[in-house]
């Protein structure tokens, strides 16, 4: 899937887009101003991440300046062109501001996640917590969330309520993940045994909720009916789930030269992904379970990956991803067909096509 870059006009930062060039051309031809919207988002992100305190400004812009696909603002823009409403009634400024809100929250979670996971790098640079300490990384994430909340208040009570609920879901998903982690936890933490149900609970909160909100914002701010808003939100939820499923599959099945990711990275970090959980569900006392219970050195991880590649669990995970993509695309049926629906359909299908 080719990824064009935006035109760096008006001082905006060129970045890769998560849509093919031909789809982008159709969107622009039909007046769905993806480039203009994302240019506005980029400019307003810099404004909202600004602080009069020089050091706060430096840290808050650290990951922002490192780039990113702005996937969530893109979804806000596309979902904003779904409802059956006159083209000139689509609120450019409101959609751009909503894109800023979801991207600020996403950036904030990256600062926090890197502390939780003790990640060494993010977007090709040293993680903020290693460069400046855990405390400063956490506070910077909080600062960006505060800026997102401030902007949401300018768009109204509904927008503020939705992002507040989303933040709660993000936290619930992260807490559930910690409870189910394979690391040693204090006795005061109630441990949750790994299961597919627990995994889905984590992903729905930690990953899918903000993507769902991005699509909900777009349809809501463009005057969509209750039916349209909920359909857009469900589309976003399913897409968020599907992309996580495909990431899990790629961790096992991908060619490292193509994906840039060493197979079994999640396994080595103690993360039980969908294919792993399906395999353990089928054979809880088998060879894979024994490997996972041992010290996960490079040899054991390689052996586990080899077992998974030959296991029906991988095909089952692929089927789950495909079913979830189809569920997302089905939600688009309530909207009139156009460039936005076709783009969102292609985007959802990419969760499957990237698997090869």
Placement of each model-derived feature along the sequence:
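All-alpha prenyltransferase/terpene-synthase fold signal
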Residues: 1-356
């Amino acid at each position: 899937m080719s990824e064009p870059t935006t035109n760096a006009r008006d001082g905006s930062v060129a970045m890769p887009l998560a849509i093919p060039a031909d789809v982008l051309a159709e969107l622009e031809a039909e007046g769905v101003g993806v480039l203009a919207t994302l240019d506005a988002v980029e400019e307003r992100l810099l404004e909202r991440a600004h602080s009069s305190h020089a050091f706060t400004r430096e840290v808050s812009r650290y990951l922002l300046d490192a780039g990113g696909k702005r996937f969530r603002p893109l979804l806000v823009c596309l979902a904003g062109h779904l409802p059956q409403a006159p083209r000139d009634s689509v609120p450019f400024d409101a959609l751009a501001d909503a894109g800023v809100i979801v991207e600020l929250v996403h950036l904030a979670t990256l600062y926090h996640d890197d502390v939780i996971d003790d990640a060494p790098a993010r977007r090709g640079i040293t993680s903020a917590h290693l460069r400046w300490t855990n405390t400063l990384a956490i506070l910077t994430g909080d600062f960006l969330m505060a800026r997102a909340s401030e902007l949401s208040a300018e768009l109204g009570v509904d927008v503020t309520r939705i992002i507040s609920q989303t933040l709660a879901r993000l936290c619930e998903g992260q807490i559930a993940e910690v409870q189910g982690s394979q690391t040693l936890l204090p006795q005061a933490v109630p441990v949750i045994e790994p299961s597919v149900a627990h995994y889905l609970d984590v992903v729905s909160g930690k990953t899918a909720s903000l993507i769902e909100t991005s699509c909900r914002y777009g349809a809501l701010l463009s005057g969509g009916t209750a039916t349209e808003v909920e359909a857009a939100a469900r589309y976003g939820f399913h897409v968020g789930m599907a992309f996580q499923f495909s990431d899990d599959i790629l961790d096992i099945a991908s060619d490292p030269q193509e994906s840039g990711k060493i197979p079994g990275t999640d396994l080595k970090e103690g993360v039980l992904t969908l294919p792993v959980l399906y395999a353990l569900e089928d054979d809880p006392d088998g060879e894979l379970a024994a490997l996972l219970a041992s010290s996960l050195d490079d040899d054991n991880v390689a052996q586990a990956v080899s077992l998974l590649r030959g296991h029906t669990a991988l095909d089952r995970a692929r089927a789950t991803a495909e079913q979830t993509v189809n569920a997302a695309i089905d939600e688009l049926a309530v909207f009139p067909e156009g460039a936005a629906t076709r783009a969102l359909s292609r985007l959802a299908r990419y969760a499957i096509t990237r698997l090869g």
